[in-house]
Design a protein with these regions (language model features):
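Short linear/disordered segments characteristic of secreted peptide precursors
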Residues: 9-13
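Short S/T/G/P-rich N-terminal loop/turn motif that feeds into the first structured element of a domain
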Residues: 24-84, 112-117, 134-198, 211-213, ...
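Short, glycine- and small/hydrophobic-rich beta-strand elements in well-ordered beta-sheets
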Residues: 81-103, 130-145, 194-219, 233, ...
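Short amphipathic alpha-helices in soluble, non-transmembrane regions
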Residues: 119-127, 232-238
């Protein structure tokens, strides 16, 4: 049957915040503490001096999966093995069903070689599972050193373990943004940070460059252990001057991290 992920999450949340009186939305409940899931020996210079790519690919279930448990399990196992053969790291599969009517599955891949990511994508589409999937959206991003703080690196390349939920979206800056003085952009982005991650330190962000890769300039992924934290940081960042310099920041794809087998168990069968 389908694992009780709600119960599992509740248990994890209770364990993390045992002994506190904070509400789920309070910032006291998410103080800056070292999370044992994360690496603490990350070399920022090494990360910045190498190329690191991510690929976010979203699919819809085009037709129902087989009703036979054995056949369905075989499809998932064989497809997963085939996709892993590309060599790309799979940061997560995400169930995005219900958040958008046209999407069901998001895959987040990581690698230092963009062609390896392409191979992983091709393999998924060519796999037994791929025959049931229709492409909806895909975007590749590249880590480039942050303009104002070289020690700010994407969570996905900075030793931060995957969280229970992910939100991915692209965005495009206004035409005049890049013509502003660097110190002015730094001031605006500092305020943006104070209204976002400073208030929600448990939310982990990965901002990657996408110039020339697609129709976007940047692609972002936020991760947290509960959905309300993702909503909170996005809402808080609306009250900043930086919002005046955004031309486009859709579509959004959001969902819980699941195994591919879990995802398949939730899908229609025929």
């Amino acid at each position: 049957g389908v694992p009780d992920r709600v119960g599992e999450h509740a248990a994890r949340h209770q364990a993390r915040h045992a002994g506190t009186e904070a509400t789920p939305h309070s910032h006291a409940a998410h103080a800056r503490v070292t999370d044992p899931r994360d690496a603490t020996d990350v070399d920022f210079d090494e990360v910045n001096n190498k190329q690191h790519y991510a690929l976010y690919s979203v699919f819809a279930l085009g037709e129902s999966l087989p009703a036979d448990d054995g056949e369905r399990g075989r499809i998932i196992a064989e497809s997963l093995d085939y996709v892993k053969g590309a060599g790309a790291e799979i940061r997560g599969f995400y169930d995005v069903s219900g958040f958008r009517a046209e999407a069901d599955l998001m895959v987040w891949w990581l690698d230092d070689d963009p062609e390896v990511l392409q191979d992983a994508y091709h393999r998924l589409r060519a796999s037994a599972l791929g025959k049931f999937l229709d492409p909806v959206w895909s975007c590749m991003g590249l880590h480039t050193p942050a303009e104002f703080n070289k020690r700010h690196i994407p969570a996905c390349f900075g030793g931060v373990a995957p969280r229970d939920w992910a939100m991915v979206y692209p965005f495009v800056r206004s035409y005049d943004w890049y013509l502003k003085a660097p110190e002015e952009r730094a001031r605006i982005m500092a305020e943006h940070g104070r209204n976002g991650f400073a208030q929600y330190p448990d939310v982990k962000g990965s901002t990657l460059s996408a110039f020339g890769f697609s129709d976007y300039e940047w692609v972002l992924a936020f991760e947290a252990d509960s959905l309300d934290r993702l909503e909170g940081v996005m809402h808080a960042q609306r009250y900043t001057e930086a919002r005046l310099y955004v031309r486009e920041d859709t579509p959004f794809f959001t969902g819980p991290r699941v195994s591919l087998g879990e995802w398949a168990e939730r899908q229609p069968r025929a």
